[in-house]
């Protein structure tokens, strides 16, 4: 069987177009455009690329995009002070602080300082807790983007055995909660997991997020499985590959995401959706 390719680039563009139409309708109705503040500390080249793509996406859909590029020498106190100012700014619906932060700044303290209603990355413990309790508000972008891909391809997830490889706070853990909401029987594997192959071979839906090129061989994939590859790894020759050996896995899977052009574009598209949601649901004047 040759797998159908899940085209994240096309779906992400659809999502962004839908958001752009809603923003145009808001502005036409006399409401303000949503505002996103993107904070970058230091000059990490990968972070600069990510931030540029987020700012570009913002402007394309008609958001007000505010950029805060702070020097590497910025102190934790200065960064927290900026977040306090942005929390109090009624024209800003989302605050995004690009990770990783320089040494000496506590990521957890910074992410927890962002007001949960402006936490468009979905990392605040309040938002993660809401997802745990089956009452989500702003949801972590990559897991939510993956669920959107599955929905747009009309893949019925109820009753599937889902296996998540990797237990990070950004992808693996929140992904497991999204999969529970999507009706899956969910297993999360990590570096202490014994006999990883056994888990992979029994997965109807496999989500791999470890950041190691070719970590999952294609012959481990169950015939007809759905494979979602979150990894983005640049090889020495400049080629970008995922965590799964794509060519071999595509011979066995029913659906597979490519790298690049699979999950990556959905992360930014979901960030855009979250910012609109924050604006409409939490920051618009409510009818009394």
UniProtKB/Swiss-Prot annotation:
SUPFAM superfamilies: Aminoacid dehydrogenase-like, N-terminal domain, NAD(P)-binding Rossmann-fold domains. It comes from the Bacteria. Its EC number is 1.5.1.5, 3.5.4.9. Signal peptide: none annotated. Keywords: Amino-acid biosynthesis, Histidine biosynthesis, Hydrolase, Methionine biosynthesis, Multifunctional enzyme, NADP, One-carbon metabolism, Oxidoreductase, Purine biosynthesis. The keyword NADP applies. Pathway: One-carbon metabolism; tetrahydrofolate interconversion. CDD domains: NAD_bind_m-THF_DH_Cyclohyd. One of its GO terms (cellular component) is cytosol. It holds the Pfam family THF_DHG_CYH_C. One of its GO terms (biological process) is methionine biosynthetic process. GO terms for molecular function: methenyltetrahydrofolate cyclohydrolase activity; methylenetetrahydrofolate dehydrogenase (NADP+) activity. It catalyses: (6R)-5,10-methylene-5,6,7,8-tetrahydrofolate + NADP(+) = (6R)-5,10-methenyltetrahydrofolate + NADPH; (6R)-5,10-methenyltetrahydrofolate + H2O = (6R)-10-formyltetrahydrofolate + H(+). NADP(+) binds at residues 166-168, 232. Belongs to the tetrahydrofolate dehydrogenase/cyclohydrolase family. Catalyzes the oxidation of 5,10-methylenetetrahydrofolate to 5,10-methenyltetrahydrofolate and then the hydrolysis of 5,10-methenyltetrahydrofolate to 10-formyltetrahydrofolate. Homodimer. This is Bifunctional protein FolD.
């Amino acid at each position: 069987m040759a797998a159908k390719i899940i085209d994240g680039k096309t779906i992400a563009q659809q999502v962004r177009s839908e958001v752009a139409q809603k923003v145009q309708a808001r502005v036409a109705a006399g409401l303000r455009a949503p505002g996103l503040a993107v904070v970058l500390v230091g000059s990490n080249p990968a972070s600069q690329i990510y931030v540029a793509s987020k700012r570009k996406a913002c402007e394309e859909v008609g958001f007000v995009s505010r950029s805060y590029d702070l020097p590497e020498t910025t102190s934790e106190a200065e960064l927290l002070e900026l977040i306090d100012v942005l929390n109090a700014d009624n024209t800003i619906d989302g605050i995004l602080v690009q990770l990783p932060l320089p040494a000496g700044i506590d990521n957890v303290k910074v992410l927890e300082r962002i007001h949960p209603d402006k936490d468009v990355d979905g990392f605040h413990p309040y938002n993660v807790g809401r997802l745990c309790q089956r009452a989500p508000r702003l949801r972590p972008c990559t897991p939510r983007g993956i669920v959107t891909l599955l929905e747009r391809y009309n893949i019925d997830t109820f009753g599937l055995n889902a296996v998540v490889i990797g237990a990070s706070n950004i992808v693996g853990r929140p992904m497991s909660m999204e999969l529970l909401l999507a009706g899956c029987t969910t297993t999360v594997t990590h570096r202490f997991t014994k006999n990883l192959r056994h888990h992979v071979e029994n997965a109807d839906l496999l989500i791999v997020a470890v950041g190691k090129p070719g970590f999952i061989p294609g012959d481990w994939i169950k015939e007809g499985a759905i494979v979602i590859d979150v990894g983005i790894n640049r090889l020495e020759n400049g080629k970008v590959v995922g965590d799964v050996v794509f060519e071999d896995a595509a011979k066995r899977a029913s659906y597979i995401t490519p790298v690049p052009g699979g999950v990556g574009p959905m992360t930014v598209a979901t960030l855009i959706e979250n910012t609109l949601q924050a604006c409409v649901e939490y920051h618009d004047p409510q009818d009394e």
